[in-house]
């Protein structure tokens, strides 16, 4: 412990573990500590079920109907991986895929007028969908063809649109798309949580829709993947990688002090010993004075004994409740997985509802989602503060990750990882290396 390291990492959340893995691969000497006795920090998967009851201070033991406690791995933060997204690229680049198996999420659904509809995943499904009328479908198809052909580097594909200036609102107008289709596109395909994007330049939205389409094209049922045994496998996979490249790991280490001299971090004190470092990466829980609260997320873990109604008995799915449908500013999300992913006892389903808190009564805000899940066997409610670092860390060399947001995928987490990497090293995070090792990561069905 009393040694000199290039980088010390505090917390074993996904952001920290990926950065720790990448720094080790890059030849840095890394010490990685966590004050908790388990991996994953805020993004852990809790097992056995008894521990989840304790964590949420529920009295007594889980009932016998819940099956064996150790058959459960319950994610605290519900997220899926976009099949063609940045996290999958990071998994391939680092070959962490060899430690994990994935399944495709069976379907994505959208809420409209109190009912849920499947988000079409093929042209045939789109034509048969009752989400929009026939003429609307034709216009929508034209729009999707435009998006598919759009290439930032080729102005011939712009058709009079300036990707850096034209707003997304104007692009929708160009294709004469109605409000329902706009809601559906912005929230179910581009996966925006609010409507703020409408007046921004259209380039980002078009790229988001492309990511959705390309991810969907990989496996056909939905654009999402999920690891067997839960999301807690992700940080552990990257922690293994770090260890292979010489990183040192210590769990259950109380952090007494982060030592700063002349405004720069020089080490970390734990159990009376000091480990020295040039740079520090940590999550907000280790540096309360260096982060600020920018909002809250409510998450409700629901245990069910049945698949969600109107999902065709899917054993996994995502449901998006667009804000316009329930008079809110931000969308409500439901992520559902089950015993099929080795995260619950036989015949049991886990549905996690999440959204950005907007009122003094967050539990009321998510009622529309809970109604879709009835009957619910057991609920676990958490309201988490969203912390972000107060500064970039370039002066102190203390680089703080952002709290996990309410989105149902890891794209924003990956943006944070790339951003921290750039601030730490001065160079862009480079995916180019990955192309050499590109292979499919889809586990057996």
From Swiss-Prot:
Positions bearing Phosphoserine: 130, 382
Record PTM N-acetylmethionine, positions in chain: 1
Membrane topology qualifier: Peripheral membrane protein
Any Pfam family the entry gives: GDI
GO CC annotations on file: cytosol; Golgi apparatus; membrane; synapse
Modified residues (N6-acetyllysine): 112, 269
UniProt-recorded Gene Ontology molecular function terms: GTPase activator activity; Rab GDP-dissociation inhibitor activity; small GTPase binding
Keywords: Acetylation, Cytoplasm, Golgi apparatus, GTPase activation, Membrane, Phosphoprotein
Top-rank taxon, per record: Eukaryota
Tissue/organ expression: Ubiquitously expressed.
Location of N6-succinyllysine modifications: 57
Gene Ontology biological-process annotations: negative regulation of cilium assembly; negative regulation of protein localization to cilium; protein transport; small GTPase-mediated signal transduction; vesicle-mediated transport
UniProt subcellular location: Cytoplasm; Membrane; Golgi apparatus, trans-Golgi network
InterPro entries named in the record: FAD/NAD-bd_sf, GDP_dissociation_inhibitor, RabGDI
Gene3D superfamilies in UniProt: FAD/NAD(P)-binding domain, Guanine Nucleotide Dissociation Inhibitor, domain 1, Guanine Nucleotide Dissociation Inhibitor, domain 2
Keyword Metal-binding: no
Assigned protein family: Belongs to the Rab GDI family.
Subunit composition and interactions: Interacts with RHOH. Interacts with the GDP-bound inactive forms of RAB3A, RAB3B, RAB3C, RAB5A, RAB5B, RAB5C, RAB8A, RAB8B, RAB10, RAB12, RAB35, and RAB43; binds RAB3D to a lesser extent. Interacts with DZIP1; this interaction negatively regulates the interaction of GDI2 with GDP-bound RAB8A.
General function of this protein: GDP-dissociation inhibitor preventing the GDP to GTP exchange of most Rab proteins. By keeping these small GTPases in their inactive GDP-bound form regulates intracellular membrane trafficking. Negatively regulates protein transport to the cilium and ciliogenesis through the inhibition of RAB8A.
Protein name: Rab GDP dissociation inhibitor beta
Biological source species: Rattus norvegicus (Rat)
């Amino acid at each position: 412990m009393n040694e000199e390291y290039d980088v010390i990492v505090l917390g074993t959340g996904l952001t920290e573990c990926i950065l720790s893995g990448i720094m080790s691969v890059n030849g840095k000497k890394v010490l990685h500590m966590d004050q908790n006795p388990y991996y994953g920090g805020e993004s852990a998967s809790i097992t056995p079920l008894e521990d989840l009851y304790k964590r949420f201070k529920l009295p007594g033991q889980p009932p016998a109907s819940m099956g064996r406690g150790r058959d459960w791995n319950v994610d605290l933060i519900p997220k899926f991986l976009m099949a063609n997204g940045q996290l999958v690229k990071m998994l391939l680049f680092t070959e962490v895929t060899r430690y994990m198996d994935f399944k495709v999420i069976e379907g994505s659904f959208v809420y409209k007028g109190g009912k849920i509809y499947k988000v079409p995943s093929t042209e045939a499904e789109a034509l048969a969908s009752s989400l929009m009328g026939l003429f609307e479908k034709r216009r929508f198809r034209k729009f999707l063809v435009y998006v598919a052909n759009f290439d930032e580097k080729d102005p011939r594909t712009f058709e009079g649109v300036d990707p850096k200036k034209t707003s997304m609102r104007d692009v929708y107008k160009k294709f004469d798309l109605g409000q329902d289709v706009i809601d559906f596109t912005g929230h179910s395909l581009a996966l925006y949580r609010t409507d703020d994007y409408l007046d921004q330049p259209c380039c980002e939205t078009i790229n988001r829709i492309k990511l959705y389409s390309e991810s969907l094209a990989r496996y056909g049922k939905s654009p999402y993947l999920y690891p067997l045994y839960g999301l807690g496998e992700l940080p552990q996979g990257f922690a293994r990688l770090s260890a292979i490249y010489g990183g040192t790991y210590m769990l259950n280490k109380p952090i007494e002090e982060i030592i700063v001299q002349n405004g720069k971090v020089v080490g970390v004190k734990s159990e009376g010993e000091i480990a020295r470092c040039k740079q520090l990466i940590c999550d907000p829980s280790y540096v309360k004075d260096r982060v600020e609260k920018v909002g809250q997320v409510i998450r409700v873990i629901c245990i069910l004994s049945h698949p969600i109604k109107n999902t065709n008995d899917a054993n996994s799915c995502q449901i998006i409740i667009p804000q316009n449908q329930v008079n809110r500013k931000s969308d409500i999300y439901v992520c559902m997985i089950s015993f099929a992913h080795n995260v619950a006892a036989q015949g049991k389903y886990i549905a996690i509802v999440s959204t950005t808190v907007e009122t003094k009564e967050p539990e009321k805000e998510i009622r529309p989602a809970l109604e879709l899940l009835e009957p619910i066997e057991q609920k676990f409610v958490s309201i988490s503060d969203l912390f972000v670092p107060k500064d970039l860390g370039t002066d102190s060399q203390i680089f703080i990750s952002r709290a996990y947001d309410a989105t149902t995928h890891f794209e924003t987490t990956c943006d944070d990882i790339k951003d921290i990497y750039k601030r730490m090293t001065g160079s862009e995070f480079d995916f180019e290396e990955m192309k050499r090792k590109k292979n499919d990561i889809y586990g057996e069905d």
